[in-house]
From Swiss-Prot:
GO terms for cellular component: plasma membrane. InterPro entries: TAS2R (IPR007960), TAS2R38 (IPR030050). GO terms for molecular function: bitter taste receptor activity; G protein-coupled receptor activity. Signal peptide: none annotated. This is Taste receptor type 2 member 38.
């Protein structure tokens, strides 16, 4: 079915503003995730053992560095190279497909983190849950390798779904008054099918994430009821760990839903309506979500907080030394 599409031009001011916001989001996202990566990788360099959660955070930060890089490349494509009055170029197709795969890996890693929190914090007398928690703690490395394998399988299937369909273009110009014309790219439908397939592939990890997060919420409720009965002191390490874990998981859920909605909305904006401003807004929202969750992860992780404190103290002492040096030089003069 052919669709009448109105191609709207984007002013230089809008493109410049979007590019500035994209650079800012890329800088914040790159710095926060690179910080998580470097803190944990430094322990690997020093041959210190990494905990299971640190291993997952290390992999999660790598996947998000790729996400931010791809979204920044998408922003550059939108502002400088891709004209929506023309068919989507191959490089923009490749960026979108790579983003879908990186986003898939990001979801699997967040699910792995949720299962790990669940296995560590849930207190249960059921034998099955105890065995499952022990299995998750012991098999975390195998789970990470499985995530890499799933991402590779998703890559192959998305590429097959994209290239297995016939590629041809139908472009019919009806009239050119007010830059209105009939423009339909059958080739872009293949991108939509790949996008839909990739998100259907995301249903199993998302359900696992919801189940493990729900179990953690139930466990927190039971723990708080137990504390109300037996003690009045709410400064319990287990309670604080529950709350920090839930804060991380709930924030990821919110950011993932917002990012997924923006991604779904961007598809018809890009393929059907050719609305570049709408696509820019969606890309900006998608780039902000991983940065927000990375900041929450840093605030909820003791090792990362200590690293932030150390860096701030070092920066403060360096500024103080420079100020004292300038004051001494002025006194001598």
């Amino acid at each position: 079915m052919l669709t009448l599409t109105r191609i709207c031009t984007v002013s230089y001011e809008v493109r410049s503003t979007f590019l500035f916001i994209s650079v800012l989001e890329f800088a914040v996202g790159f710095l926060t995730n690179a910080f998580i990566f470097l803190v944990n990788f430094w322990d690997v360099v020093k041959r210190q053992p990494l905990s299971n959660s640190d291993c997952v955070l290390l992999c999660l930060s790598i996947s998000r560095l790729f996400l931010h890089g791809l979204l920044f490349l998408s922003a550059i494509q939108l502002t400088h190279f891709q004209k929506l009055s023309e068919p989507l170029n191959h490089s923009y197709h490749a960026i979108i497909m790579l983003w879908m795969i990186a986003n898939q890996a990001n979801l699997w890693l967040a699910t792995c983190l949720s299962l790990l929190y669940c296995s560590k914090l849930i207190r249960s007398s059921h034998t099955f849950l105890i065995c499952l928690a022990s299995w998750v703690s012991r098999k975390i490395c195998q789970m990470l390798l499985g995530i890499i394998l799933c991402s590779c399988i998703c890559t192959v299937l998305c590429v097959w779904c994209y290239f297995s369909r016939p590629h041809f273009t139908v472009t019919t110009v009806l009239f050119t008054n007010n830059n209105t014309r009939l423009n339909w790219q059958i080739k872009d439908l293949n991108l939509f099918y790949s996008f839909l397939f990739c998100y259907l592939w995301s249903v199993p990890p998302f359900l696992l994430f919801l189940v493990s997060s729900g179990m953690l919420t139930v466990s927190l409720g039971r723990h708080m009821r137990t504390m109300k009965v037996y003690t009045r002191d709410f400064r319990d390490p287990s309670l604080e760990a529950h709350i920090k874990a839930l804060k991380s998981l709930v924030s990821f859920f919110c950011f993932f839903v917002i990012s997924s909605c923006a991604a779904f909305i961007s598809v018809p904006l890009l393929i059907l309506w050719r609305d570049k401003i709408g696509v820019m807004v969606c890309v900006g929202i998608m780039a902000a979500c991983p940065s927000g969750h990375a900041a929450i992860l840093i605030s909820g992780n003791a090792k990362l907080r200590r690293a932030v404190t150390t860096i701030l103290l070092w920066a403060q002492s360096s500024l103080k030394v420079r100020a004292d040096h300038k004051a001494d030089s002025r006194t001598l003069c």
